[in-house]
């Protein structure tokens, strides 16, 4: 695909979850499908007709095994935050239908224990997970998502 063709593609609607524990640390998972250190917060597509908040709670459950009853939604981003994939990834992901993702983010407070987290889900996304100080998030994320993570941190700053 040429850069011009990619620029004409839409963004995939997606939600992201910033899950914080009682110490103010943020859940990140190491992606299973990446050989390099590619940590990220839980995220995933919004199904047609699905409410974004419901999608965020579903994605949290699907990717971390966290029961939605243990996650309190504290805030959400006002806007949808887009990011573009690197050109070489566009044809490999989502059958080349999207240039990247447009994400609605939710800050959730985790009211469970570490033992309530189970990344060995039906369709595992992560090979390992950890709690990370919010200040260390951006440097641990793949470069093409860093601007979105900066915007998410800015949006939720009053709650961190």
UniProtKB/Swiss-Prot annotation:
InterPro entries: Nudix_hydrolase, NUDIX_hydrolase-like_dom_sf, NUDIX_hydrolase_CS, NUDIX_hydrolase_dom, RppH
Organism: Roseobacter denitrificans (strain ATCC 33942 / OCh 114) (Erythrobacter sp. (strain OCh 114))
Pfam families cross-referenced by the UniProt entry: NUDIX
Coiled-coil ranges from the UniProt annotation: none
NCBIfam families in the record: PRK00714.1-3, PRK00714.1-4, PRK00714.1-5
EC number, UniProt record: 3.6.1.-
GO MF assignments: bis(5'-adenosyl)-pentaphosphatase activity; guanosine-3',5'-bis(diphosphate) 3'-diphosphatase activity
Record family assignment: Belongs to the Nudix hydrolase family. RppH subfamily.
Keywords assigned: Hydrolase
Role, per record: Accelerates the degradation of transcripts by removing pyrophosphate from the 5'-end of triphosphorylated RNA, leading to a more labile monophosphorylated state that can stimulate subsequent ribonuclease cleavage.
CC cofactor: a divalent metal cation
Hydrolase is among the record's keywords: yes
Key word Hydrolase present: yes
Lineage: Bacteria, Pseudomonadati, Pseudomonadota, Alphaproteobacteria, Rhodobacterales
Domain Nudix hydrolase: 10-154
Name by which UniProt lists this protein: RNA pyrophosphohydrolase
GO biological process: nucleoside phosphate metabolic process; ribose phosphate metabolic process
Top EC class, one word: hydrolase
Motif (Nudix box): 44-65
